């Protein structure tokens, strides 16, 4: 890695026009040497390490886009230190949002990005072109066999990928070591009935040792997908597990991602992809979360667009969407997408398989 290269970071800053130049300089210092320039006596540090304000542009009466360049030498290709340099102390300042980052080519090469990406997931499902479907096992409190029964019925309806709800972990009522084999068995039975591939994504969580033990169970059961919550397990642990999950699709869940003032398209679309997410879940607008259409489009674009040599990451809109929005969703995202419908399917009760079949049929018919 060329340590003379610089990382370009874009922030959005709330400030009065007369104050923005000074505020931008303070931001550049905070995210680099973090001390008064009078304390920086070595000229090389002043020339190379101190952050530089590269551009300031208004985006509102009292809001500005500020581009700062940081020395790549301060941020080795390690998730924690990279994010620390991008937004560490400044994340505590309420007037600043981390909007985007432009990395030198050595960073994507070092982090690696998705191992399988969209094409890898499509290959596992035998679905080369159409949009994909997903659902979730819930609620918390169900025993392993009850969750397995839900998975079986969803799979009989043809749902491509069935994941644990993010609230289901390694709890007493549904221990990972009991739940995963039960659901995997139910999925195998449903796949045999339908003569098609459908996938189960267990939620891998806990300490690094816990997650490694859980990965062993996933492999033993012959599963192809895991789900992790990067902001809960830690970005460094997420990246490490994504690398160790050789041959597995890695699905990233956005839990806790709203606690930071980081633009969703950057965090869920770009950074999760950089660290190894093959697919990224996020709330679609109009559901029970407050994302806008512009945010959702930017996020999906960040996940899928050409970016260095990284494989694209599949957008997975979710969050309170229902079958009656399928046409709208596919018109918005196109076919390189997985629509994740959970609660509104499960509410069908005894008609769960029939509703799942309607969901998958409507998605499959799009564009025909």
Curated annotation (Swiss-Prot):
It comes from Rhodopseudomonas palustris (strain ATCC BAA-98 / CGA009). GO terms for molecular function: magnesium ion binding; ribulose-bisphosphate carboxylase activity. Coiled coil: none annotated. InterPro entries: RuBisCO (IPR033966), RuBisCO_lsu_C (IPR000685), RuBisCO_lsu_C_sf (IPR036376), RuBisCO_lsu_N_sf (IPR036422). This is Ribulose bisphosphate carboxylase-like protein 1. Unknown. Probably does not have RuBisCO activity. GO terms for biological process: carbon fixation. Belongs to the RuBisCO large chain family. Type IV subfamily. It comes from the Bacteria.
